[in-house]
Structures are given as C-alpha cells and as structure tokens.
Amino acid sequence: MESAPQIAAVAQSVKNAGAQVLRGGAFKPRTSPYTFQGLGGVGVELLVQAGRDAGLPVITEITDVSQLPLLEDVDILQVGARNMQNYSLLKALGELRRPVMLKRGLSATVEEFLLAAEYILSGGNEQVILCERGVQSGLSAARSALDVAAIPVLKKATHLPVLVDPSHAAGRSELVLPLALAAAAAGADGLMVEVHDRPACALSDGGQALTCRQFQELTEAVNALLPYAWRGESL
C-alpha cells in the first residue's frame, strides 16, 4: 500500500475478481530498518477509503497498543507473526469487540499458536481468525514451509476460522498459486494473497505479489477446486 491511486486501483481489481476483504499494511514490521515501513496513519485512511469505495471491509496489521486510536475505522485487526506472543497486545485485543486475525509465529507450534489465540478469547473477544503463514525450518524450497497439515489439525481442534497466507510462505510469486491450491484442498476457510498493480515496482514484498490478472486466475483455479476440498470428513 503506497499511494491513494495504487490502493484504489488494486481494491477495485481484487473486488472484481471475487475478493471479500481488502488488506493493506500501514504499519509494516520489516526485518531491515532501512526498508519501507508503511504509510502509518495516512495509510490507514487511504485503506479505509479504498475499502469503502470498493465495498469491501478492510484489515490491517496492528503492531502496538498505541496504534488503536488510529485504527478505529478498520474492520479487522491483524496480529502479525512477529507479534503472535506479544501478550500485552493480545490482552488488549481481547478487550475489543472487533475481529482479530492472528498469524502463526515463525517458529511456533500449533499448541503455542492456539494458546496465543486463547489470550484474545479469554478476554471476551470471540471473533478470532487463525492464519497459517508457514514456519521457518531451513529446509523448505520456499521462504517458509507452509504447514498444510496444520489446517485440518486446527479445524479439528477449534471452531475458529482458519485462513492461509500462501504469499508470505512462498516468498516468490510463481509459488503462490500451488500453495494456495494446496491450502484450499486441505480445507482452509480463506486465503490472504498479496496483489500489486506493478509488482516489479513495489516498495515491499514485490517478489511474492501477484498482478491483478494473476489474482483473477488464482481465484478461478481455487473456485474450481473447492468442490473437492476437504471439509472435515474422516478417511
């Protein structure tokens, strides 16, 4: 999310392709302090406006409790992988009555992931969404190892919706579609996919972002697979 025209164009394109929620990063926790960190409060305003114009609810990442006043108009709050065990943040989100999407930590077990979710749930906020984004193993051909097996395990262990982020697991755009299809086949309730109108010019995560046309192709492929996806049946 880099400018008003860019986010507006992408918002309308993904809406036309079937997206149900618009995600944009205004506060971006980056590995390097020298890379693009997001547009901050201005970015939140651009995201909310783009979502309203496209008719989509919006989601963005919160990295610190102090950002809550800036995020009052955001429909869903995201807790990133690096903050999965930021317990003061999780407790604060537990006091809200707004959906929270919790991403699995980079090296977290499924049990640790679920216990992190309990911090939010135990505060009274029952609107928690789980997101598998891959774990670091050092052995994966992609940037992270997408734990496909975690999808049915989480679905069996909890009533919470389970989403998958194939983009961050892949790290490369050409791997996003196969990982998305694997996640859909394993029973994921939804996908979070990075899209950019010009990935080669993106200020962050351009290598894993799909073009608007590629996102359209992904949604078509996933929709074709869904009738055959696992839905909790015993083998």
Language-model features: locations:
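Catalytic domains of carbohydrate-active enzymes, especially glycoside hydrolases
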Residues: 9-25
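Catalytic beta/alpha-barrel core
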Residues: 23, 37-39, 55-66, 75-88, ...
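Glycine-rich, proline-tolerant flexible connector loops at the mouths of alpha/beta enzymes
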Residues: 23-42, 197-207
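Alpha-helix-loop-beta-strand connector modules within alpha/beta enzyme cores
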Residues: 36-60, 92-99, 148-163, 208-231
